[in-house]
């Protein structure tokens, strides 16, 4: 329908010309009086004029001062937009109502995002912690494991009359993160088992190896070690695995603590954001209250100045009236004196005239 279409510039110009000639009334006679077709009903013309074309209506977004004023007035009057628009110059009730709806939707969306937003845990934050811990752990293992393995090898070699030969040559640990501590950042979560020292008794190796001269102080301690059983072998083979299990437990506890720390940090960040939002709203409210109080004070001062002007005007009028009355009285007295002097002069003139007439008559009567 035509009523639902956007207004064109020609239609707006037609409405302005109609209002200049006939005033903002009788909108159903626009087409008839202007001799131009306008497919709009009277209500649409009235709304268009009142909300968009009326002189003095501001266009564009609300300023920060107007926003604070609208927030304060909405808290005071509720959704009575006509009453609010009467206190916000240049803004219509329809415009303020639409702005308030958009403002409330934005606030609700921000609250939902701040309450329900869950940030993914960034595993890269733990890399430095795990790396430093792994380096420290590897240094400790590099000092403990070779000594234990060497002691176990010497004990087993002296008890069996030959040498123990491992399947692989024991190398000092690499100072970087071992593979069983490394975690995949791609999400595969493949964890390697911790390294352990494995000793084997190989007959071919023992037969092929050349006998070495026995060490006297080791031969003295050999019966005691034989009575205690294969303690050196158990020490060399079990100690790394036990330490590896305790390290894995400690690592799991460390990761759990880091996660709890991250969750606490996230909760603190959310709380800080919400507190900042509440503080911002409180600042807006205080700013609006300050603006309102300033405006009320200015209105009060203007009212007092107006009363003083009225009092001054009345005082000046009173003084002017008294002066006018005094002037009128002086003029009346002066006129009375003039009239009295004129009457005296007239009476004297009449008396003189009569005297002259008498004298002239006497002279004529004499021979």
Curated annotation (Swiss-Prot):
A GO molecular function held by the record: protein homodimerization activity
Primary location recorded for the protein, binned into one broad class: nucleus
Location of this chain's protein in the cell: Nucleus
Signal sequence, renumbered to the chain: none
Domain topic, free-text comment: A C-terminal domain (252-356) is required for dimerization.
Record GO cellular component, one term: nucleus
Record-linked Pfam families: Myb_DNA-bind_6
Xref: SUPFAM superfamilies: Homeodomain-like
Name of the protein this chain belongs to: Transcription factor AS1
Species: Arabidopsis thaliana (Mouse-ear cress)
Expression induction or repression: Circadian-regulation with an afternoon peak in long days and with a broad night peak in short days. Expression of AS1 in stem cells of the shoot apical meristem is prevented by SHOOT MERISTEMLESS (STM). Expression is activated by GTE6 during leaf morphogenesis.
Tissue: Expressed in roots, stems, leaves, flowers, siliques and in lateral organ promordia. Found in the inner domain between the adaxial and abaxial domains of leaves. Expressed in the phloem tissues of leaves, cotyledons, hypocotyls, and roots.
GO biological process: asymmetric cell division; defense response to bacterium; defense response to fungus; flower development; leaf formation; leaf morphogenesis; negative regulation of DNA-templated transcription; polarity specification of adaxial/abaxial axis
InterPro entries assigned to the protein according to its UniProt record, in alphabetical order: Homeodomain-like_sf, Leaf_Dev_Regulator, Myb_dom, SANT/Myb
CDD domains in UniProt: SANT
Protein's job: Transcription factor required for normal cell differentiation. Positively regulates LATERAL ORGAN BOUNDARIES (LOB) within the shoot apex, and the class III HD-ZIP genes REV, PHB, and PHV. Interacts directly with ASYMMETRIC LEAVES 2 (LBD6/AS2) to repress the knox homeobox genes BP/KNAT1, KNAT2, and KNAT6 and the abaxial determinants ARF3/ETT, KAN2 and YAB5. May act in parallel with the RDR6-SGS3-AGO7 pathway, an endogenous RNA silencing pathway, to regulate the leaf morphogenesis. Binds directly to KNAT1, KNAT2, and KNATM chromatin, regulating leaf development.
Record's subunit section: Homodimer. Heterodimer with LBD6. Interacts with LBD6/AS2, HIRA, a probable histone chaperone, and RIK, a predicted RNA binding protein. Part of the AS1 repressor complex composed of AS1, LBD6/AS2 and HDA6. Interacts with CO.
Keyword Transmembrane helix: no
PANTHER family noted in UniProt: PROTEIN ROUGH SHEATH 2 HOMOLOG, TRANSCRIPTION FACTOR AS1
Keywords per UniProt: Coiled coil, DNA-binding, Flowering, Nucleus, Repeat, Repressor, Stress response, Transcription, Transcription regulation
DNA-binding region(s), chain positions: 27-53, 81-104
Keyword Glycosyltransferase (UniProt): no
Gene3D superfamilies from the UniProt entry: Homeodomain-like
Ranges in a coiled coil: 260-344
Domain (HTH myb-type): residue spans on this chain: 1-53, 54-108
Disrupted gene: phenotype observed: Plants with double mutations in this protein and in RH10 or AS2 protein have abaxialized filamentous and trumpet-like leaves at high temperatures. In double mutants, shapes of epidermal cells of the filamentous leaves are simple and rectangular, similar to those of a petiole, but different from those of flat leaves of wild-type plants.
């Amino acid at each position: 329908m035509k009523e639902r279409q956007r207004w064109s510039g020609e239609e707006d110009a037609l409405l302005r010309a109609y209002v200049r000639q006939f005033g903002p009334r009788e909108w159903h006679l626009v087409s008839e009086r202007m001799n131009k077709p306008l497919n709009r009903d009277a209500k649409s013309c009235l709304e268009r004029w009142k909300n968009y074309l009326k002189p003095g209506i501001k266009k564009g977004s609300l300023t920060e001062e107007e926003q604070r004023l609208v927030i304060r007035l909405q808290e005071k009057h509720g959704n009575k937009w006509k009453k609010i628009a009467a206190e916000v110059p240049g803004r219509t009730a329809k415009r303020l109502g639409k702005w308030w709806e958009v403002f409330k939707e934005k606030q609700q969306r921000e609250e939902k995002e701040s309450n329900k937003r869950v940030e993914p845990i960034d595993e890269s934050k733990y890399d430095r912690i795990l790396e430093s811990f792994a380096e420290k752990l590897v240094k400790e293992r590099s000092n403990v494991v070779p000594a234990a393995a060497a002691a176990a090898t010497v004990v087993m070699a002296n008890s069996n009359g030959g040498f123990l030969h491992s399947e692989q040559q024991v190398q000092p640990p690499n100072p970087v993160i071992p593979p069983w501590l490394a975690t995949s950042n791609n999400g595969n979560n493949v964890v390697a088992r911790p390294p352990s020292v494995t000793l084997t008794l190989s007959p071919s190796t023992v037969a092929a190896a050349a006998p070495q001269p026995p060490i006297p102080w080791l031969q003295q301690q050999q019966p005691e070690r034989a009575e205690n059983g294969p303690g050196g072998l158990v020490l060399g083979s079990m100690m790394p695995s036990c330490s590896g299990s305790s390290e894995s437990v400690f690592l799991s506890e460390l990761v759990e603590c880091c996660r709890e720390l991250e969750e606490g940090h996230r909760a603190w960040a959310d709380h800080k954001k919400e507190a900042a939002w509440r503080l911002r709203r409180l600042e807006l409210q205080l700013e609006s209250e300050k603006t309102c109080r300033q405006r009320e004070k200015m209105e009060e001062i203007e009212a007092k100045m107006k009363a003083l002007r009225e009092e001054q005007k009345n005082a000046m009028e009173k003084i002017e009236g008294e002066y006018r009355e005094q002037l009128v009285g002086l003029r009346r007295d002066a006129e009375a004196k003039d009239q009295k002097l004129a009457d005296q002069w007239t009476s004297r003139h009449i008396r003189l005239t009569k005297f002259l007439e008498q004298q002239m008559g006497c002279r004529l009567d004499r021979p």
